[in-house]
Each structure stands twice: as C-alpha cells, then as structure tokens.
Design a protein with these regions (language model features):
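Gly/Pro/Ser/Thr-rich low-complexity, intrinsically disordered segments predominantly at protein N-termini
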Residues: 1-201
Length: 201
C-alpha cells in the first residue's frame, strides 16, 4: 500500500500498511512518515543497550526489544523507539508494546532537537513508562529522565564512562562504557578544552 500525500490513517491501518515493507515508518497525527536510515554507530549503541537489558528484563518477566516494537503514544500516533522494555503480558502476535516501562532513543545531531522535545513528551505521557534514556551517538552523553512517585519527571545528564545508570524497574544498571562499547566517542568538549586567542585590535 502506497501512502498518498497527506493521507490520514488510523493506527490499525498504519500497522497493516507497513507490514512487510522495507524501511522504517512512524505515524504522527494520522500521517505516515518514512524514517531516515541509521549510521553504524547508532546501530552499535542500540545493540549494546539491548545486550545489557535483555537478561535483566527476562529476570523480571519483561522483554527488551529493538526498534521493531511500536509504541502508540496517542490516538493516531505510533512511534518506534530504538529499544523498549515491555512488562505487559507476553503476546508474540502483538505489534505494539502493552506496558512499556523503559524507552531508549539514540539521537544524532540531526534528530536531537526533535527527540528531546516532541517524542520525549509523548513517552512521558504513557502511564507505564517510568524511565526514558536519550543517548547521544556522536558524544558520550546520556540524558536520564525519571518519573518520580509524585508523577513529576526529573532529568539528569550522565557523561562519566564508569557511572552507573540505575534501572529500578529491572533492579539493574548500565554504564556508559557498556553503551558505547567498541565506539570511539568522547565526552562533549568543555570550555577549558578550547584555546582562546588574544583579543583583536
């Protein structure tokens, strides 16, 4: 099924339309959009995170899955995060996560602004989600968004490679050096890292 320009789809129509199609798509307010392909570094990070989360999720009766698992974030919006931990009842035929608790997005310079705004708000609006990790692919930096008991969200930036990021719902943790394993990424430059020349005349 080809997507006509500005053709409005329901969630069910969208999921049926993309079944078996090459490429990645998302549904945003009823409109299907093709997603750009990912660089190798992005894919390595996703694989590293998935490798760390799968055994921890299994111990808690949950499932950590890749970007093929959909999240319905609105009545006519479907997202495909890079990694999702779903703690709902197992359903091998399901196309969407029933009770997502952890959502992971790997961002690049071209996607960071959007991922840090619209998608984040959508993920935080899902009642079962209590942790969102936004991982930079080009520098060593992870933004950790946690839902507190009062319903409010906190944000923490983690940049130290040996720092643990706690995953309370899985009773586990992950370090930056696990996330960026095999990749040559560095922390973001600090002001003192730049040499500032003398002022001009």
């Amino acid at each position: 099924m080809a997507f006509a320009e500005a053709e409005k789809l329901t969630v069910d129509q969208f999921l049926e339309a993309i079944a078996g199609r090459d490429g990645r798509f998302e549904l945003v307010r009823g409109i299907a959009y093709a997603m750009a392909g990912a660089k190798q570094g992005h894919n390595v990070i996703c694989s590293n995170v998935l490798t760390a989360l799968v055994p921890a999720a299994k111990r808690k009766g949950c499932r950590a899955t890749s970007s093929d698992t959909a999240l319905q974030t609105g009545p006519d919006t479907v997202r495909y995060p890079d990694v999702v931990v779903d703690c709902g009842p197992p359903n091998p035929a399901a196309l969407t996560a029933s009770s997502p608790t952890i959502v992971v997005e790997v961002s690049s310079m071209s996607t960071a602004v959007f991922d840090y705004s619209a998608k984040l708000r959508e993920y935080q609006a899902i009642a079962s989600v209590d942790l969102v990790l936004q991982i930079e692919s080009e520098i060593a930096l992870v933004k950790v968004h946690r839902r507190q008991q009062d319903g409010y969200w906190t944000e923490e930036t983690v940049e130290a490679f040996d720092r643990d990021i706690d995953l309370p719902s899985l009773e586990a943790s992950i370090k930056l050096n696990e996330i960026y394993d095999t990749l040559d990424v560095r922390p973001r430059p600090r002001l003192q890292d730049f040499k500032i020349g003398p002022a001009g005349p």
